[in-house]
Amino acid sequence: MDLEAKVKKMGLGHEQGFGAPCLKCKEKCEGFELHFWRKICRNCKCGQEEHDVLLSNEEDRKVGKLFEDTKYTTLIAKLKSDGIPMYKRNVMILTNPVAAKKNISINTVTYEWAPPVQNQALARQYMQMLPKEKQPVAGSEGAQYRKKQLAKQLPAHDQDPSKCHELSPKEVKEMEQFVKKYKSEALGVGDVKLPREMNAQGPNRMCIPGGDRSTTSAVGAMEDKSAEHKTTQYSCYCCKLSMKEGDPAIYAERAGYDKLWHPACFVCSTCHELLVDMIYFWKNDKLYCGRHYCDSEKPRCAGCDELIFSNEYTQAENQNWHLKHFCCFDCDNILAGEIYVMVNDKPVCKPCYVKNHAVVCQGCHNAIDPEVQRVTYNNFSWHASTECFLCSCCSKCLIGQKFMPVEGMVFCSVECKKMMS
């Protein structure tokens, strides 16, 4: 790819979602504007997933690329125009008759994703076993949750070097090898089955979602109400409770045929969020989402959110950073050798701290320098000096003395307090 094409691609990436409102900050954010190298909005500092950005095609491309060159090619399709793999997510539309006074109307519910099984009754019951706020019904809180988890759990920059910032040729090669390795050793997609079906599942049968799907014989089991409350020989690998015979369970091939999960228990062992679209990574007998699997293998830069493939990086405040990304969160000035203050787990240089974050002294009404001693009570602060921490009535210095606080004022005695009331 020549320089002009690279610049154009970079520009398109930064134009994506431009101006989209922030769902978290509301009117406080002027609209989404991607930071040059951080994966956040320049205006409000929230991530792209917190903004109302339409990303359906982009997310399908990302997941499609993840499944490329794996056994899960049945879940992708390549566009004839550019050959880019696209994720063929299973969309489920349910129609429910609703009785009205004069006639019957039809209520349609669209799930933006559903497990790719032929038996729709099984897929429907799977959805009902998820918390309502996490069911991906189009236009709902659950659909927004799925969108957010797709961005959080499966970052494009964890699999595609072109989505990363200024990797060297050596780093690109190392990343490609890393991605190839986790695709072959850890990546998997859960499959929905009835526990009774596992008896017929042998170790020589591979179950690929979208390929070997549940058969229509499962319909009878779904409709057998007497079976719904019977327990089985299987227990959930997560919560350890028994599986009910008529309830769907999730099976993960890499975990083995002896492990099953309740739909709501198929979660990442680190963040404990539902594994989006049942996409998992298996390591040391644990389920991980893509992000936390990669975190267990490589250091991640707290500045740009990318995995670090360089041998040289810095560690500060129990986090890892590319050398060039240990910068002030407000102004982006490099902090190596400089005084900084951590604000919400983000490093901020001294000038920006004083300007944007420092508490104001109740005595002199000036910002309190981060290196200066202070006195704090509830939400109020004072310079720990004879000029500032004084009785609000008689101006007696209160350092080392007992005092009586009243909102933003302090008093040395009951008498002084009464005089000011």
Swiss-Prot record:
InterPro entries: LIM1_Testin, LIM2_Testin, LIM3_Testin, PET_domain, PET_testin, Pk/Esn/Tes, Znf_LIM. GO terms for molecular function: zinc ion binding. CDD domains: LIM1_Testin (cd09413), LIM2_Testin (cd09416), LIM3_Testin (cd09419), PET_testin (cd09829). One of its GO terms (biological process) is negative regulation of cell population proliferation. Keywords: Cell junction, Cytoplasm, LIM domain, Metal-binding, Repeat, Zinc. PROSITE patterns: LIM_DOMAIN_1, LIM_DOMAIN_2, PET. It is found in: Cytoplasm; Cell junction, Focal adhesion. The keyword Zinc applies. This is Testin. Interacts via LIM domain 1 with ZYX. Interacts (via LIM domain 3) with ENAH and VASP. Interacts with ALKBH4, talin, actin, alpha-actinin, GRIP1 and PXN. Interacts (via LIM domain 2) with ACTL7A (via N-terminus). Heterodimer with ACTL7A; the heterodimer interacts with ENAH to form a heterotrimer.
